[in-house]
A protein has these predicted regions:
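Conserved N-terminal beta1-alpha1 strand-loop-helix module at the mouth
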Residues: 1-108, 115-117, 149, 155-176, ...
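Short secondary-structure transition/capping segments
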Residues: 3, 126-137, 157-165, 181-185, ...
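Glycine-enriched alpha-helix->loop->beta-strand junction motifs that scaffold or abut catalytic
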Residues: 77-78, 103-106, 125-131, 151-155, ...
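Short catalytic-loop micro-motif centered on adjacent basic/acidic residues
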Residues: 82-83, 109-110, 132-133, 157, ...
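Glycine-rich phosphate-binding active-site loops on the catalytic face of alpha/beta enzymes
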Residues: 83, 125-142, 179-188, 228-246
């Protein structure tokens, strides 16, 4: 069983455990998100993981055509796409993810509150190349089990952390790709300074992704100096997709 949680996180996780798996033959090749990030860095570009989400608990309400957005991000040079599939608070769906997966050739991150094997099975079936795991909502043994389960499909786990304790937990599971979230999932407050501090002590061997709160190039440059390898950006790009050209 996942950790005991409160508020909206508890509601989301309880609902996630009840969602039915979508099991079908995968139609899409696997695209390596780590390789995509490395190639962008080799070209002296900022690797951007552009996120599609219609809504968020922090107040975002932005309805865009998902295919138009995904194709635009691909054309403008995103390293990967992150797609919210959580329905209650983010208005996400498996159908939107699968539609995007059929129309772009970028690595796709399955962004949800993953607590069951069924969700991982679904992610693979609908075309995911990477799957988010959130340390905050999983017990240590659950995290490591799901980490290995994701890898068994050939997908990449992105392990999300909020603090130094989370970092140590992620490292103990062998995390090769770590996301450092500026947003506290309880309060929803954003602190980009915390990301910069955690980047400096994150395992050198891992690919480090700065998540949440990134609005401009100056923030990216500061996070690069702290050790970030890639940047997951949602709200800023959902509001203005053209902004990616200023951030890459």
């Amino acid at each position: 069983m996942p950790k005991e949680l409160n508020g909206w996180l508890d509601e989301v996780v309880k609902a996630a455990k009840k969602r039915k798996a979508v099991i079908k033959s995968r139609e899409r090749n696997l695209y390596d998100i780590k390789d995509s990030i490395v190639k962008k860095k080799e070209k002296k570009l900022n690797p951007i993981i552009a996120e599609f989400k219609r809504r968020s608990p922090s107040g975002l309400k932005q309805d865009r055509d998902p295919l138009e957005y995904a194709k635009l991000m691909e054309r403008f040079g995103a390293a990967a796409l992150s797609i919210l599939t959580e329905p209650l608070y983010f208005s996400g769906s498996y159908e939107t993810f699968e539609a995007i997966s059929r129309n772009v050739k970028l690595p796709l991150l399955f962004k949800d509150f993953v607590v069951t094997e069924a969700q991982v099975d679904t992610a693979y079936s609908i075309g995911a190349d990477a799957v988010l795991l959130i340390v905050k909502i999983l017990k240590d043994n659950e995290l490591c089990f799901l980490y290995d389960y994701i890898k068994s499909y050939g997908m990449v786990p992105l392990v999300e952390v909020e603090n130094e304790k989370d970092l140590n937990t992620a490292d103990a599971c062998g995390a090769e790709m770590i996301g450092i979230n500026a947003r506290d999932l309880n309060s929803l407050n954003v602190n980009v300074d915390r990301v910069a501090a955690l980047l400096k002590i994150a395992p050198l061997k891992s690919i480090k992704v700065a998540e949440s709160g990134i609005q401009d190039r100056s923030q990216i440059l500061r996070l690069l100096e702290s050790g970030a390898d890639a940047f997951l950006i949602g709200t800023a790009l959902m509001k203005d997709p053209q902004k990616i050209k200023l951030l890459i």
